[in-house]
Amino acid sequence: MAGNSIGQAFKVTTCGESHGAGLMAIVDGVPSGLPLTSEDLQLDLDRRKPGTSKFATQRREPDEVEIISGVFEGKTTGTSIGLLIRNTNQKSKDYSDIKDTFRPGHADYTYSMKYGFRDYRGGGRSSARETAMRVAAGAIAKKYLKQRLGIEIHGHVVLMGNEAAAVTDPNQIDWQFVNSNPFFCADPDALPRFEALIERLRKEGTSCGAKLEVIASGVPVGLGEPVFDRLDADIAHAMMSINAVKGVEIGDGMRVAEQFGHIARDELTPDGFTANHSGGILGGISSGQDIKVSIALKPTSSITTPGKSIDQQGQPVDMLTKGRHDPCVGVRATPIAEAMLAIVLLDHYLRHRGQNADVTQPVAPIA
């Protein structure tokens, strides 16, 4: 099964299924000498893991990560880093009655048609459980980016269903507050509305989508490879690989269709750019401004409202999904999106350093 790796100079390969023995990752390209412990990775894993909030799935997994290679005496050696998380709270019997049917909105049908066989337990490889390893690998990237380059990456929820948080200037966001509440939301006034929405969804047996914003600050100018490996193209690819993501915007995104050129262009002055409509990327290369990415996630397909589907014989069936599921996947998607942005940025930084370390820039960076 191809498509399990991302990156070139910094490469992450994952494996494992939702109800298998565990999840694993191989992380290649981490420079030597980076102080690293499992606790560094656990901080982000604890932000993503299930069972930590009444507003998310109640499957309880400790998600304790083990570093099994690539680190010696607390520092990276420059060799492949092996990561392992063991599954401990599988309830495969919740899925025994759907092994011969296809859940609408899930990958059951497409996996079966592509491979002729599938692991029906919790979605197998298509489950969002796989993203735990992305978060672990992304934590390595985040630490390197922050410690060596001063790059910081933060995400927050801006929309859940029909409830929106107040749009806030990233420079004014209290990130400590964002990370202390279960919705990763920067707007205190939105929290009661988000809570009420989740409770209503549970009572009605349905779910809702969400929109998140992820921001990388301190990114140097010059990251990105024209033309097919543009930085924004690789970011979009990484974000679209996250389960349930159906839309990605860089900067103003779709709103640029309504703008005029004299407003949308990010003009340059000796003191910096006058705007950042492009989200910190021009011509596929980072401009030195904050990189701003928004993603839209569809509603969870596993809901208790009955729906129509077919079985493996092509016969119509009525579906009622059992198991432990998120009323809104956006609640736990923020650290996943942060991880994917970190993976892409570190990959492009290492590629840029390898090719252009000796380049003399004609002017001082203005961002």
UniProtKB/Swiss-Prot annotation:
InterPro entries noted in UniProt: Chorismate_synth, Chorismate_synth_AroC_sf, Chorismate_synthase_CS
Keywords from the UniProt entry: Amino-acid biosynthesis, Aromatic amino acid biosynthesis, FAD, Flavoprotein, FMN, Lyase, NADP
Binding site for NADP(+): 48
Pathway assigned in UniProt: Metabolic intermediate biosynthesis; chorismate biosynthesis; chorismate from D-erythrose 4-phosphate and phosphoenolpyruvate: step 7/7
Required cofactor(s): FMNH2
Catalytic activity: 5-O-(1-carboxyvinyl)-3-phosphoshikimate = chorismate + phosphate
Binding site for FMN: 125-127, 243-244, 283, 298-302, 324
A Pfam family annotated for this UniProt entry: Chorismate_synt
EC class of the enzyme, as a word: lyase
The protein, known as: Chorismate synthase
Organism: Psychrobacter sp. (strain PRwf-1)
Gene this protein is translated from: aroC
